[in-house]
């Protein structure tokens, strides 16, 4: 007998230069699944706002929506995956999260951010390889052990470079057969994989 699809609320966190509209295709695929979906808008001023501050904002928005204890699933795309992970590890989100899906997120940093000055674009600088934020998150990820963690990445990603390092230090990881960063949230092959991960319980 197949298990029923989960009805836990799902939170979708967008990335740099994106808005919640990014998830429209995914949300259409989820219609009829009887689960609440929340896609908050996190203005980041072109990457100037530190990711910890955005994670704090995310915490407040989730609590406004479902209080402090409702169990959720979380999916973050690109920078949104690092924001989501920061919320999980530093703002207590792991205590209430069943599943975390990181999609094309620079969890180990990205070379494309290396030359960006932190004084001007603090949020972008948080995604440098070896940034203080990523060193902290990767140095102690014990809080993620209670969460089902899944990473999806594009090998040829030019936004998160190298693409194969856009993975969490724990859980499963899958290379998606697409050619670009944005196709991770738009290509049917990628959407199929995401839907499968979201619906299996």
Q: For each predicted feature, which ranges?
A:
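The alpha/beta-hydrolase serine catalytic core
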Residues: 107-191
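Serine-dependent carboxylesterase/thioesterase catalytic core
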Residues: 10-14, 21, 31-42, 48-145
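Post-His helix in hydrolase/transferase enzymes
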Residues: 54, 185-198
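Short amphipathic alpha-helix
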Residues: 25-26
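Glycine-/small-residue-rich active-site loops that bind phosphorylated ligands and cofactors
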Residues: 18, 46, 182
């Amino acid at each position: 007998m197949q298990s029923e699809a989960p009805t836990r609320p799902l939170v979708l966190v967008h990335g740099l230069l994106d808005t919640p509209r990014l998830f429209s295709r995914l949300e259409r695929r989820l219609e009829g699944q009887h689960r609440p979906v929340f896609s908050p808008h996190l203005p980041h001023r072109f990457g100037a706002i530190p990711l910890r501050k955005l994670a704090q904002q995310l915490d407040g928005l989730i609590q406004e929506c479902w209080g402090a204890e409702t169990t959720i699933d979380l999916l973050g795309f690109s920078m949104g995956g690092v924001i989501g992970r920061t919320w999980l590890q530093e703002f207590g989100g792991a205590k209430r999260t069943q599943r975390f899906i990181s999609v094309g997120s620079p969890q180990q940093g990205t070379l494309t951010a290396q030359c960006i000055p932190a004084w001007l674009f603090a949020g972008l600088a948080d995604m440098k390889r070896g940034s203080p934020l990523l060193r902290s998150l990767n140095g102690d990820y014990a809080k993620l052990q209670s969460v089902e963690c899944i990473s999806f990445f594009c090998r040829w990603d030019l936004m998160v470079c190298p693409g194969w390092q856009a993975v969490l230090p724990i859980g499963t990881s899958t290379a998606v057969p697409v050619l670009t960063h944005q196709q991770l949230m738009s290509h049917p092959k990628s959407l199929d994989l995401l839907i499968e991960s979201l619906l299996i319980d």
